[in-house]
Swiss-Prot record:
Protein name, per record: Protein flightless-1
Purpose of the protein: May play a key role in embryonic cellularization by interacting with both the cytoskeleton and other cellular components. Alternatively, it may play a structural role in indirect flight muscle. Vital for embryonic development.
Gene for this chain: fliI
Gelsolin-like repeats (start-end): 512-589, 633-703, 749-822, 1168-1242
GO cellular component, one term: actin cytoskeleton
Family matches, as PANTHER family: PROTEIN FLIGHTLESS-1 HOMOLOG, VILLIN
Chain positions of LRR repeats: 4-28, 29-51, 52-74, 75-99, 100-122, 124-145, 147-169, 171-192, 218-241, 243-264, 265-287, 289-312, 313-335, 336-358, 360-381
Amino acid sequence: MSVLPFVRGVDFTKNDFSATFPSSMRQMSRVQWLTLDRTQLAEIPEELGHLQKLEHLSLNHNRLEKIFGELTELSCLRSLDLRHNQLKNSGIPPELFHLEELTTLDLSHNKLKEVPEGLERAKNLIVLNLSNNQIESIPTPLFIHLTDLLFLDLSHNRLETLPPQTRRLINLKTLDLSHNPLELFQLRQLPSLQSLEVLKMSGTQRTLLNFPTSIDSLANLCELDLSHNSLPKLPDCVYNVVTLVRLNLSDNELTELTAGVELWQRLESLNLSRNQLVALPAALCKLPKLRRLLVNDNKLNFEGIPSGIGKLGALEVFSAANNLLEMVPEGLCRCGALKQLNLSCNRLITLPDAIHLLEGLDQLDLRNNPELVMPPKPSEASKATSLEFYNIDFSLQTQLRLAGAAVPPSMPSSATPKDSTARKIRLRRGPRSEGDQDAAKVLKGMKDVAKDKDNEAGAVPEDGKPESLKPKRWDESLEKPQLDYSKFFEKDDGQLPGLTIWEIENFLPNKIEEVVHGKFYEGDCYIVLKTKFDDLGLLDWEIFFWIGNEATLDKRACAAIHAVNLRNFLGARCRTVREEQGDESEQFLSLFETEVIYIEGGRTATGFYTIEEMIHITRLYLVHAYGATIHLEPVAPAITSLDPRHAFVLDLGTHIYIWMGERSKNTLNSKARLMAEKISKTERKNKCEIQLERQGEESAEFWQGLGMTSEEADAAEPPKEHVPEDYQPVQPRLYQVQLGMGYLELPQVELPEQKLCHTLLNSKHVYILDCYTDLFVWFGKKSTRLVRAAAVKLSRELFNMMDRPDYALVMRVPEGNEMQIFRTKFAGWDEVMAVDFTRTAKSVAKTGANLTQWARQQETRTDLAALFMPRQSAMPLAEAEQLEEEWNYDLEMMEAFVLENKKFVRLPEEELGRFYTGECYVFLCRYCIPIEEPENGSEDGANPAADVSKSSANNQPEDEIQCVVYFWQGRNAGNMGWLTFTFTLQKKFKAMFGEELEVVRIFQQQENLKFMSHFKRKFIIHTGKRKDKAHTAKGKSPVEFFHLRSNGGALTTRLIQINPDAVHLNSTFCYILHVPFETEDDSQSGIVYVWIGSKACNEEAKLVQDIAEQMFNSPWVSLQILNEGDEPENFFWVALGGRKPYDTDAEYMNYTRLFRCSNERGYYTVAEKCADFCQDDLADDDIMILDNGEHVFLWMGPRCSEVEVKLAYKSAQVYIQHMRIKQPERPRKLFLTMKNKESRRFTKCFHGWSAFKVYL
């Protein structure tokens, strides 16, 4: 059955119908529009007379001289386009204008010398175009009858006047009289044309004497064209036309414009090119809607452009070429909407610096300015705020949402330093227009509503305490795979209430039409989506996948898989429900208004491979150059088609022969070989054999492929030159198949720059590419099945309409499996294969060769939740004492060893708890952990007395013995101690205690709480080694200075030796200062000061005294307790290097936090260190963020990456914004510090700061 009777419209543009016109056109009895442009028609085809329902006919750019006959029989014709032909008055029948439905007539660009006879009978005309003819006069009756005209174009004729009846055109909106000799005509009919919106009088010899002074009476006039006249100045009546939107005054003799231009408040386009203007009026800057200003070829200089031009906030195009400009005002760079700026052919010396801030500028023309020196670009640092950091949104609102925290209702803006560049950007934006102000009001209202919702959902507590992050549900914490669902579903799916159904075809979901909803094939599977609104007005979904009884395994599996993909695509929380044929749930059946209908068989094909014999048709292609690429043009597979100047490709399916003429170019030969390789790889699975054939050396198989033997080829005439030198293949025509309710349409796709690009192909549609010798039907992946079937039939009809050679074919091309012959018809389609030799082929196939472009399209994973977590609170003293008591109660025995002379020896009892930074210690701890006895009684109601008697009969359970070995390594100790322990002492311990032995390696100031509890807060760290007696440069015993401090609780109390300097004192802490005396017998005599700060707590004051008495328990040492302010000048301050200012409080201890920024997990994360952090937590490979409550430091390790630097910088900014909301009374400033360049404000946050450990 032919589909031509169902065709409603078709575009045959650029088809050659000069020889014969398709007779099958008669079958298109329902066609309503028909385009036959550029079809080389010399007369009206007879077949058009059968198209009785034709309403729109276009025949422009043909060779028509007469249109007698068939057109007059088209009673439904409403629009007729006959422009660009060779029509004369004698070739237009008067009967044509008897068509009552005719409303649009275009006879422009013909050879008419007068208005066609009988035109006045076409009383229903609303559009009439008679331009570009040779008409000398308009007959009086014409405008008496054509009073409904809306558009009238009489330009480019020889009219000297218009009839008085022109005033009857009261409905006329567009009147074009351009380029007519109307010097003696004053247009007195204008006041009657009150509906006129467009008036074009270009080249009508207007002067001040014959200018229509009544033009200001046209209340609806929007566009006025007065170009190409001899106006020395603009008449005053033009200034009074306040409704003007577009005004063209180019090619006149204007020397000035008055201040009256400010009346044109609606003006959007003003063309003043090619006049004698010296200056533009300042009132021009008062036109808020002006978008285009053209002042080319005038006499403007720097002073001629008003300085207030920056007020034109809507200006998009400014062109001032061929003037006398040496400089332009800086205000021009404040036009934020400027897109095109033309200053060519001037005398420019330089431009304002703000020219670089015009971010929306697309075109900048500065040619022919030989003395121009461009200003330097502003510093890139000023633009850092607008840079994107690896596709990560570092806004505080976004990061709070990702972390699961409540977004505060108000976000205060940070105080930023003044920036001249930013100020210029703000000035460039200019004042807001009325539309912007209205939009701002709407935006403010939306913000207020959002604030109210935020106050209800997650308001900040009144007590000011930081909120704890609510833990996510288990299903929310599951990581969703980063998949691109756009290949399966469209953006609009699930966004509107209703029912949407997909069928599974070739492993993929394919949306079906609404008319077949509720009709399921037994051999298919479907995905059903129900979209609705819930009680809160939010979208809600129900997802089902239906399984037919006869469906294949691949369809069943893919239905379930893509149902889950649909849920992930929508972000739905619902389940995907499985429905089987004959066992559907009531919920599923209620989705359909009628009963579900089962249809036998299957509508879609399985995705599994089916083995079938491939039938290859012998094709011979002519290889010809087309720009930088080549095209393969099919020719007849015969020896007569060969040309010695060209290369040919003979495709036999399993074999491809490259025939090279004796005078063919090597470039074409090599590209033909490359094309054959592509065909073999992409279409034949590399199983095709490629063979080169040179002229005169052809093989017998080659001639056999052309249907002849070698003897016949030798007897035949050799190939001759028959391909024309200027050979051009037929320009392909791309049609889009459109399907409606009972009709088909076949419009042509408009080609940008007349080039076929593969980007024109949309996956939702079906296209027909007509190349004359080949006709391709391209199926988009998302196109419907009905459109595909219609396209196949329509392509066959289109193929038969034209006289094509015998070797022409119709081929189907599915999206994603396009053949190379099809690809060569498009410019730049897969000419170069993506290759990156630094990565695997699988990686390149997944991301493409351009890894940077792929990365910009990805959503980078980050974890900044630690920045928004509340600070870890300090452990209360009572809880610390309880833990210390419990852990020491379980401790049955602890033996201590120290590395001495490459072996571990027992540590003297008096040195327990005293550590040295250059030593390694081993502690063997034996814990006796009691096993809790089961409670008496049972859940099943058994007799308790029986249980007691039973338990007494059995032996009591023994306590669990646990052995733990702690290996403590000082900061300055090498790894030799750990190796010695591993190969000696650890083996002995394992032999004694078996596999139950637990070994814990700990480093200085990174001890766990259980280990430190065994020393009962008397944990002392000395500098150096045990038996090395330190001496100063003068040979004296050095002064020892110890600092007592606890980080995050009493269990982390340490007494650490630091550099003796008064600057380290702090009124909140306690210190021990040992000043040795010089003696001849080398006895350890001296004086010990216990310095107690005025703000130190009583517990630490008592503790430091006990430690001092234990450390320096010698009759030769004097112990003194000093309160802050009672220090003796002689020994105390001299030992500390003199009196110096020091801190009087340690408020930072309540705010100090340390974060680590790293990429070690494969993505950027920020993790917080525990409150008991130390100097060794500063890793060289990472970046650390330190907050002391007053400053935020960004510490850079020497081996950190540039990526971490950028991301950590943005993270610190987000953290500061967050803390500004949480603690507005403590604003923080951001500082940068590097390793070995830390300031006192940074180092005071670390207990026992010293030189960094050197790694060998």
